[in-house]
């Protein structure tokens, strides 16, 4: 009988499960954690998932907004980046806690509490968000390949599909290898922009004042629009699903209160530390935009514009050099590659969680990748590889992210506030109401952004 079941599964490579397996089953509980070690050794064991989540906050889609914010309003919007990062820390900590306490990711929990039809609808919405996120990363990677190697954009877009093979190899080597590779790519981004900001010699006292909120952010319409862009990109819907899943990669006994409590503590520390690094990177991007482009008439609305400007002494002054431009392209490629790894993982989590679809890892990841590459490739062929036209896709991809946001944030706050689900680990009253307030503000801001992007609001 058992052999017949195995044969049946082989014949049906792609199938739907009545009872879904664990979230990211192949790596769930795969990382051992010490039980009686000191603080630093325990933290080292839990460090890793946070960096995978953090890359979503510094992907190519966020770059233009941050640099444009600095170029337009100097250091004034640093306070918006600070507030955005604090919001991200709260929501990502809640996502990790949901996964650790329940052993279910956000997609599985949402599906458990909705009908099959609703599960399918939510999957479509969230899958569109994954595609939107991936589009930004594909475009960023393809443009970086063109800038570095003069590779045609269409070829670069096709090459990005090979990311799937890299991820499959890393999964075979263990989840810690994925964490290490992504951490290395993020370190490259951090070092490149730290170096470029040091060369730009920003005004430090003026820079620090930028972290203090001020009324102009609300009263100045142009400043408000850019602020909305920064805040709107704060919470990436797929990151909440991802965070609730990869927090389960550490091996713990959920029947033991102390182990669960410790896992929540160290996962939260890891998440906050890595999101602090994302905050630093986004700050560096805005500071670079302010130090080099504020007061100039140069356009910094596209990656190619930024690349060219960094080697133009009439725009950035004496520090201009081809090396600065090349470093920018290297960081852009690192950002695109790190984000595609996490985006593909999130695609698997969402597909399995919402519609219980199981297929071989290579097929699932290839499908997720092709769903994102195809629209970009069609767009690139239609516009004959025109970078400006292709980068316009970035703007519209953000609309899908905004639409999907409520479908991630609202369930997250609901489930983590429910004592029947979370027991004593449910949100405290002040956390719950703070989260609801933040969620409401984020949703309103994103709806406003959609209306502006589509031209309904002037």
Swiss-Prot record:
Where is this protein localized, as stated in its record? Cell membrane
Q: What is its main location?
A: membrane
Under the cellular component aspect of Gene Ontology, which terms does the record hold?
plasma membrane
Q: Could you tell me which InterPro entries the record lists for this protein?
A: NRAMP_fam
Which residue windows are transmembrane per the record? 38-58, 76-96, 119-139, 151-171, 180-200, 223-243, 275-295, 315-335, 370-390, 393-413, 437-457
Q: Which GO terms describe its molecular function?
A: cadmium ion transmembrane transporter activity; manganese ion transmembrane transporter activity; metal ion binding; symporter activity
Q: Is Nuclease set as a keyword in this record?
A: no
Q: How does it sit in the membrane?
A: Multi-pass membrane protein
Keywords of the record: Cell membrane, Ion transport, Membrane, Symport, Transmembrane, Transmembrane helix, Transport
The processes (GO biological process) annotated in the record are: iron ion transmembrane transport
What pairs make up the disulfide bonds?
A: none
Q: What family does the Swiss-Prot or TrEMBL record give for this protein? A: Belongs to the NRAMP family.
- Protein task: H(+)-stimulated, divalent metal cation uptake system.
This chain belongs to the protein called Divalent metal cation transporter MntH
* Organism expressing this protein natively: Lacticaseibacillus casei (strain BL23)
The root-end lineage is: Bacteria, Bacillati, Bacillota, Bacilli, Lactobacillales
């Amino acid at each position: 009988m058992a052999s017949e079941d195995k044969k049946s599964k082989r014949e049906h490579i792609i199938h739907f499960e009545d009872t879904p397996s664990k979230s990211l089953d192949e790596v769930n509980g795969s990382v051992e954690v010490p039980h009686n070690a000191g603080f630093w050794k325990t933290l080292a064991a839990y460090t890793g998932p946070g960096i995978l989540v953090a890359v979503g906050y510094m992907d190519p889609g966020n770059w233009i907004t941050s640099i444009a914010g600095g170029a337009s309003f100097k250091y004034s919007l640093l306070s918006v980046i600070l507030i955005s990062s604090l919001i991200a820390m709260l929501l990502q900590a809640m996502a990790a806690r949901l996964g650790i306490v329940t052993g279910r990711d956000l997609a599985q929990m949402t599906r458990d509490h909705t009908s099959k039809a609703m599960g399918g609808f939510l999957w479509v919405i969230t899958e569109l968000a994954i595609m939107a996120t991936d589009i930004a990363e594909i475009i960023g990677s393809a443009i970086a390949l063109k800038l570095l190697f003069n590779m045609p954009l269409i070829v670069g877009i096709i090459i990005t599909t090979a990311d799937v093979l890299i991820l499959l190899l890393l999964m075979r080597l263990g989840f810690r290898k994925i964490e290490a590779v992504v951490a290395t790519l993020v370190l490259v981004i951090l070092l490149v922009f730290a170096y470029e900001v040091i060369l730009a010699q920003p005004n430090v006292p003026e820079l620090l004042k930028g972290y203090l909120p001020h009324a102009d952010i609300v009263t100045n319409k142009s400043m408000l629009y850019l602020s909305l862009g920064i805040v709107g990109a704060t919470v990436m819907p797929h990151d909440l699903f991802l965070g609730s899943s990869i927090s389960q990669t550490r091996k713990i006994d959920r029947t033991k209160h102390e182990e669960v409590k410790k896992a929540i503590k160290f996962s939260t520390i890891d998440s906050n530390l890595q999101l602090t690094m994302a905050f630093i990177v986004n700050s560096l991007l805005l500071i670079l935009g302010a130090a080099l482009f504020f007061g100039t008439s140069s356009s910094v609305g596209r990656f190619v514009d930024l690349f060219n400007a960094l080697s133009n002494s009439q725009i950035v002054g004496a520090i201009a050099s081809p090396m600065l431009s090349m470093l920018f392209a290297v960081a852009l490629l690192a950002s695109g590659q790190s984000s595609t790894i996490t985006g593909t993982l999130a695609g698997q989590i969402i597909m399995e969680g919402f519609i219980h679809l199981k297929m071989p890892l290579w097929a699932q990841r290839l499908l997720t990748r092709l769903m994102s590459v195809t629209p970009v490739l069609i767009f690139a062929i239609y516009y004959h590889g025109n970078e400006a036209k292709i980068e316009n896709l970035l703007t519209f991809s953000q609309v899908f992210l905004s639409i999907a946001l409520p479908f991630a944030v609202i369930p997250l706050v609901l489930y983590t506030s429910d004592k029947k689900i979370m027991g004593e680990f449910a949100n405290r009253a002040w956390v719950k109401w703070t989260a609801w307030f933040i969620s409401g503000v984020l949703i309103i801001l994103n709806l406003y952004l959609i209306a502006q992007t589509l031209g309904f609001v002037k």
